[in-house]
Design a protein with these regions (language model features):
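Surface-exposed charge patches
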Residues: 4, 65, 178
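RNA substrate-binding interface of SAM-dependent RNA methyltransferases
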Residues: 31-142, 206-214
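Conserved acidic residues
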Residues: 73, 135, 164-165, 184
């Protein structure tokens, strides 16, 4: 109860607090309503054309592992292409039911978060059914400009509110403007000390989750 009240009344203190592992796990177990979706369509290619991108083994593995580390509730792999869905399912089932489930139990735990859906609308319906309300949609992009929500602002919202939150990541050259315009928030771009700005989507996902859900 004290953790819940602190989250509602003084999220700034909770963000700075040194929580025990038990307290942190309890807060995540009871309160976490954060989901991640990796969109393979609609996304841009390098020429700015809207395309469907390929599903990759490493993206599914690494984002699932990051999601498990930071306590998200579900990880969606979104593609309308049945052959790519079949590939994604094969990857997931290898670690859930096949040889991989015995070879690497931690990978099995992480891949248990993964779900495959045709489109973003299917993800939204899924989350609403599971949580009883529609999620706030947070888009990520490396492109500059527009109204952006800072990491501290979004972290504060996650601490204060119980409404589920869906964070979108785009493969290829990123989410389309159509998807971004449908989102409730657009997260500020990750920036380093150089002008180079070409992180892999799995690296970007790990950084975003750490900034939003990681311990100080």
């Amino acid at each position: 109860m004290s953790l819940r009240l602190t989250r509602e009344r003084r999220p700034d203190l909770l963000a700075k607090a040194s929580l025990s592992r038990e307290e942190g796990n309890r807060l995540l177990t009871v309160e976490s309503r954060v989901y991640v979706a990796l969109l393979h369509y609609p996304v841009y290619d390098k020429n700015g054309q809207v395309v469907t991108s390929a599903v990759t083994n490493m993206d599914i593995h690494d984002i699932a592992r990051s999601g498990k580390t930071y306590g998200i509730r579900g990880f969606y792999v979104v593609t309308p292409v049945k052959a790519l869905q079949k590939l994604a399912l094969k990857i997931i089932e290898h670690w859930q039911e096949g040889y991989g489930s015995q070879y690497n139990i931690t990978r099995k735990e992480a891949l248990a978060l993964a779900r495959i859906r045709d489109a973003l609308d299917d993800v939204l319906i899924d989350i609403e059914r599971e949580c009883g309300e529609k999620p706030r949609i947070v888009a990520t992009t490396a492109r500059p400009g527009g109204n952006r929500t800072s990491f501290p602002e979004l972290r504060d919202m996650l601490l204060k509110r119980t409404q589920p939150c869906l964070i979108l990541f785009g493969t290829g050259w990123g989410l389309t403007e159509t998807i971004i315009s449908q989102s409730d928030y657009v997260l500020q771009a990750i920036q380093g000390p150089t002008d180079y700005n070409h992180l892999s989507v799995r690296s970007a996902a790990a950084i975003v989750l750490d900034r939003l859900l990681g311990r100080p």
